[in-house]
């Protein structure tokens, strides 16, 4: 994991810190379950607070997997196959990492029944070599957040987890939204200037990176998008 016993001595030693490019670690021990407080929230707050201490250097999440129920012989116990589990674990964790100034998210591992692609294990939710739901979740961030700088994003909807990004020359804005509820939302985006939506895709329990519905609000500075229940939706402007 990312433990203060290891990272603090480096951060607090000028000579060691000068030889450091990246602070990297894993996010086990329930990083996403901050509502329970205590140890989990303290770990989350510590890790997400690293950025302010790094003086322009970065922190990376370097390994995680979500495989609850894998040891059971009963398929009903294989939680990692369920869409709501994938969205509420991998999706939520990547979102929280992006909010916490993380610069790279690496999942372990790529081709495995609980990973990004199916394998020949009987527990695999998709055929060998096919992209699983976790793969589509990660691809939203790979396509819409890579090589960008995160910018502030606010939403009045507590169940709509949103991050926004801008490219290096400031000509392209992207938004990734996780709708963590049973209700569809007609979301109005407010980028602060006239824009054209050039791409909008959504992944749900039954769809993978399919075109999302763009809503014409009659205002080029406030484009709209329909965000389906329990979905991840990404928009490029």
Locate each region found by the language model.
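Noncatalytic carbohydrate-binding groove/subsite architecture in carbohydrate-active enzymes
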Residues: 1-90
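Loop/turn elements at helix/coil->beta-strand transitions in domains of secreted/extracellular proteins
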Residues: 18-21, 54-59, 100-105, 146-147, ...
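Conserved, mostly hydrophobic/aromatic
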Residues: 23, 97, 138, 175, ...
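Active-site proximal loops enriched in glycine and acidic residues that flank catalytic Cys/His/Asp
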Residues: 27, 63-66, 106-110, 177-179, ...
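Aromatic/acidic polysaccharide-binding cleft in carbohydrate-active enzymes
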Residues: 58-140, 151-157
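Carbohydrate-binding surface patches
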Residues: 155-195, 230
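Solvent-exposed beta-hairpin/edge-strand motifs
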Residues: 191-209
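C-terminal beta-strand-rich structural cap/linker in extracellular carbohydrate-active enzymes
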Residues: 214-237
């Amino acid at each position: 994991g990312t433990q203060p016993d290891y990272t603090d001595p480096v951060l607090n030693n000028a000579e060691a810190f000068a030889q450091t490019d990246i602070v990297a670690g894993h996010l086990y021990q329930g990083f996403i379950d901050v509502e329970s407080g205590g140890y989990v929230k303290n770990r989350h707050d510590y890790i997400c607070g690293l950025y302010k201490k790094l003086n322009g250097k970065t922190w990376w999440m370097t390994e995680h997997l979500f495989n609850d129920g894998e040891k059971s012989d009963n398929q009903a116990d294989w939680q990692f196959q369920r869409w709501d589990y994938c969205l509420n674990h991998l999706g939520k964790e990547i979102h929280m990492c992006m909010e916490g100034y993380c610069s790279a998210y690496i999942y372990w591992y790529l081709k495995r029944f609980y990973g990004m692609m199916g394998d020949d294990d009987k527990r695999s939710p998709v055929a060998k070599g096919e992209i699983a739901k976790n793969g589509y979740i990660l691809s939203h961030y790979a396509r819409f957040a890579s090589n960008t700088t995160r910018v502030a994003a606010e939403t009045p909807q507590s169940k709509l987890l949103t991050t926004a990004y801008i490219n290096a020359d400031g000509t392209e804005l992207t938004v990734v939204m996780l709708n963590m509820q049973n209700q569809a939302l007609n979301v109005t985006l407010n980028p602060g200037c006239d824009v054209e939506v050039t791409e909008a895709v959504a992944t749900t329990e039954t769809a993978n990176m399919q075109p999302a519905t763009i809503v014409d609000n009659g205002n080029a500075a406030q484009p709209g998008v329909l965000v389906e229940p329990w979905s991840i939706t990404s928009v490029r402007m």
